């Protein structure tokens, strides 16, 4: 749902939605009156919305828990609480595993580097540069709004996303460029609730149950890095998805699976070529 306060923005938002029709997206323009008839969570000030009919929402924590259970059910080994310090290589230069901070080496036939903004410092050991800019986003979780929206979406004028999750409402947004490790800017968190207050009922009476900030991995050219590293056999990269990690994660997995197994790719080869690690610098000393 693309929620819109200013009626003057409705036409532009509708045009944006229609421009995605060739990719299979269906949209419906809804007046403010009709929106509130369908869902009482929205304030009278909301002029209308563009409903993306094929969109969906989820609980990220439950999704990851389900994925973890599926991995274990298929014989996978998930290691928690261990830090990857580098890579293990065979005498011929092939990457054969990950070296943990404890000194243990986890070996495998193929190694996938998918460490988000930390992919670049890890790749540096191998002489590879993955130009990455951390872009911090914030979210705040609210309980007790009284009424939750039935759909998730984006508040058009503020670019703040909202997502009902069980009995709680999650608000997320901002794109704070800077190095990792800096203190949080609490005004960013306050801005999320201030934005939601303009669109949704019950924000003032709700209480905060969680606050969080995390780094989105933004590459220098805006494209993710997916595929085999030409100079290091056995090493594959899957990172740089910026704000689209959840959506692009599944297709990244399919691409890497085809790469590793040597099977036919389903994605357009020209588009895939733009994402390949071969465009990265390898001038660092390995």
Regions found by a protein language model. Name each.
Residues 11-21, 42-102, 106-110:
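Helical element adjacent to the flavin cofactor pocket in flavoenzyme catalytic cores
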Residues 1-31:
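Dinucleotide-binding Rossmann-like beta1-alpha1 core, especially the glycine-rich loop
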Residues 19, 27, 60, 156-157, ...:
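C-terminal catalytic lobe of FAD-dependent flavoproteins
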Residues 8, 33, 117-118, 251:
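Alpha-helix/helix-capping structural signal
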Residues 84-95, 105-233:
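Active-site substrate-recognition segment that forms the wall
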Residues 75-77, 169, 235:
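Short, conserved active-site loop motifs that form the nucleotide-linked donor/cofactor pocket
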Residues 51-68, 117-118, 188-195, 245, ...:
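Mid-domain beta-loop-alpha active-site segment that forms a flexible
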Residues 28-30, 77-79, 209:
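General small-molecule cofactor/ligand-binding pocket signal
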């Amino acid at each position: 749902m693309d929620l819109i306060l200013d009626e003057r923005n409705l036409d532009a938002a509708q045009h944006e939605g229609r421009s995605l029709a060739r990719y299979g997206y269906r949209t419906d323009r809804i007046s403010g009156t009709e929106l509130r008839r369908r869902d009482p969570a929205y304030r009278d000030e909301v002029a209308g919305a563009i409903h993306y009919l094929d969109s969906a929402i989820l609980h990220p924590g439950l999704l990851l828990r389900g994925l973890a259970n599926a991995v274990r059910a298929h014989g996978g080994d998930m290691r928690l609480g261990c830090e990857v310090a580098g890579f293990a290589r065979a005498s011929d230069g092939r990457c054969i595993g990950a070296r943990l901070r404890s000194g243990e080496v986890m070996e495998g036939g193929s190694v996938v580097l998918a460490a988000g903004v930390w992919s670049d410092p890890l790749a540096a050991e191998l002489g590879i540069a993955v130009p990455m800019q951390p872009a911090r986003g914030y979210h705040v979780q609210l309980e007790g709004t009284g009424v939750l929206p039935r759909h998730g979406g984006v508040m058009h004028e503020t670019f703040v996303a909202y997502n009902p999750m069980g009995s709680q409402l999650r608000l997320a947004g901002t794109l704070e460029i800077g190095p990792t490790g800096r203190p949080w800017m609490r005004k960013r968190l306050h801005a999320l609730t201030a934005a939601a207050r303009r669109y949704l009922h019950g924000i003032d009476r709700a209480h905060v149950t969680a606050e969080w900030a995390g780094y989105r991995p933004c590459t220098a050219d805006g494209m993710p890095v997916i595929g085999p590293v030409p100079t290091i056999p056995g090493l594959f990269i899957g990172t740089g998805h910026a704000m689209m990690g959840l959506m692009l994660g599944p297709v990244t997995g399919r691409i890497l699976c085809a790469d590793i197994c040597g099977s036919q790719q389903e994605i357009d080869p020209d588009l895939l070529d733009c994402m390949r690690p071969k465009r990265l610098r390898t001038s660092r000393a390995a």
